[in-house]
């Protein structure tokens, strides 16, 4: 299903589409807070230790983001999540484990995952599935990242809600939001055959649904790459 506002949104994005998609270096100017679970992992940037998580890094390109690493003893990174908070602000969350998969990786049938996490606040109005115009710059960059750095990789686009509302409504809304993001990425040149659309409703919450702040983080759409 193509969102009702998609043609208008594509018009807004056309200039960026013509200027950015063919470059070999994707610009990604962001203030990034690096976080680890468990806490206090050693953070390395461009091969040098910059202290323990949480810590802040300013980046200018996707290569800069790729060069941020975290180490926690003999534990493995089982999930890496870039939580987009605004077009110029994000958290990079390293989740560690020992010989295990994250629950989401298990259900998707992959070992580890790199997740681009778009909260409802960034991408959608409450209970809607039309993309916000403010979300387009970062989704343009997302498409460029997929086309330049992961041109053949399978990509999961997954939607989620909080625990309020009925299961039926939440599943339907989460799927429509995932489809809206996928349609936009395809319009930006990502091969639709690579995209797998999933709607999980309230499942796989990243925070507790007991608080407004937690529910806000659970209302999200993710672009997920197997690692």
Residue ranges of predicted features:
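Periplasmic peptidoglycan-binding/tethering modules of Gram-negative envelope proteins
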Residues: 60-69, 73-154
